[in-house]
Amino acid sequence: MRHRKIGRKLNCKSDHRNAIFKNMACSLILNEIIKTTLAKAKELRRIVEPMITLSKIDTVAHRRLLFSRIRNNEVIAKLFKKIGPIFYNRSGGYTRILKCGFRFGDKAPMAYIELVDRVRKSKEKKKLSSNNNLIKNK
């Protein structure tokens, strides 16, 4: 029985699961939004939020601890230089999960997971502003 077991197995071995979430955490931090299944998004939130909490205070110990988990210097640099200062005053809830329908092949529920205070790219801003102009003109 799986009473009081924390986490999802996701039908894979523990080494594979750890590798999946390490890569997904790197992708989320670098891109600030990714699309994945709902179960993986919920598990990824449990991994990424403590990382962001550690990155709010820039110490050598925190850098080494995060490097032992991620093993990617580019991601560590972005965490401490950009993401940590953005979330400094926020006490939790750094990610948002948005459901986005079902996958075509197997109807698995899909979701976007994104950082809450992410910086939107100029292409997205243009799209949003053009939609607002169309609504105002009607």
UniProtKB/Swiss-Prot annotation:
Protein name per the record: Large ribosomal subunit protein bL17
GO BP annotation list: translation
InterPro entries assigned: Ribosomal_bL17, Ribosomal_bL17_CS, Ribosomal_bL17_sf
GO MF term (any one): structural constituent of ribosome
Gene3D superfamilies referenced in this protein's UniProt entry, alphabetically: Ribosomal protein L17
Subunit structure: Part of the 50S ribosomal subunit. Contacts protein L32.
HAMAP family membership: Ribosomal_bL17
Any one annotated GO CC term: cytosolic large ribosomal subunit
Domain of life: Bacteria
Pfam families reported in the protein's UniProt record: Ribosomal_L17
Spans through the membrane: none
Similarity remark: Belongs to the bacterial ribosomal protein bL17 family.
Keywords from the UniProt entry: Ribonucleoprotein, Ribosomal protein
